[in-house]
Amino acid sequence: LYPGYLATYRRYVRVLQQKNALLRHSANGQERPYAEKRTLLEVLNTELAAQGEALQQRRREYLELLAPRACANYAELSHGAERMSIRYAAQFAPGGLAALLRQRQEEELRAGQSLCGIHREDLELLLDDQPARVYASQGQQRSVVLSLKMAEAAAAASITGEHPVLLLD
C-alpha cells in the first residue's frame, strides 16, 4: 500500500539476518576478533536503526488509519457490548531505536541473537482494555478479526482508490 515499504522491509530483514549470523558466531566464539565483531555490529545496528525507524513510522501511520475503522466496525458487530481498542506495542519511542540497539548490544552479544527491533513489536487488540487474545471468547476473537479485515479493506481502498475483494470462509 505504501511505495517503498516492501523494499525497506527487505533491507531490514537482510541486515537483521546478517546481524543474527554475526551474533550466533560471536556467542560460539567463532571467527573474527572481538573488536572487529563489535565494529561490524555497530555498522549493522546503524543500518537496522535507519530501516527500522522508517518501518515503524509507516506502521504507525497505517495504524492511525486502521484503528478507528476497526473499532467502529467492532462496535457495530457487537452492538456496542464491548469497546475495542488497538495499541501498537513498540519497544522504543520514535527516534529511539539506535539508542536501544546500543544499550542492548552487550546483552545481544552474550545471547547470540537480536533482542530488540521492530521485528519484536506487535499490535495489542483490547476489548474493554483487556487483551483479546487472553480474555475474549472465540466469537469475540472472530469479530475482532473480521473488524480488522474490514478496516484493512477500507484502508486499502482509501490509499489505492481500488476496492479489494474480501473472501470470507
Tell me what each language-model feature is.
Residues 1-22, 169:
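Extended, charged alpha-helical "arm/stalk" segments used for dimerization and assembly
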Residues 32-167:
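Conserved NTPase motor "head" modules and their coupling/switch loops across ABC/AAA+ ATPases, GTPases
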Residues 23-31:
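Secondary-structure edge/capping motif, primarily at the C-terminal ends of alpha-helices
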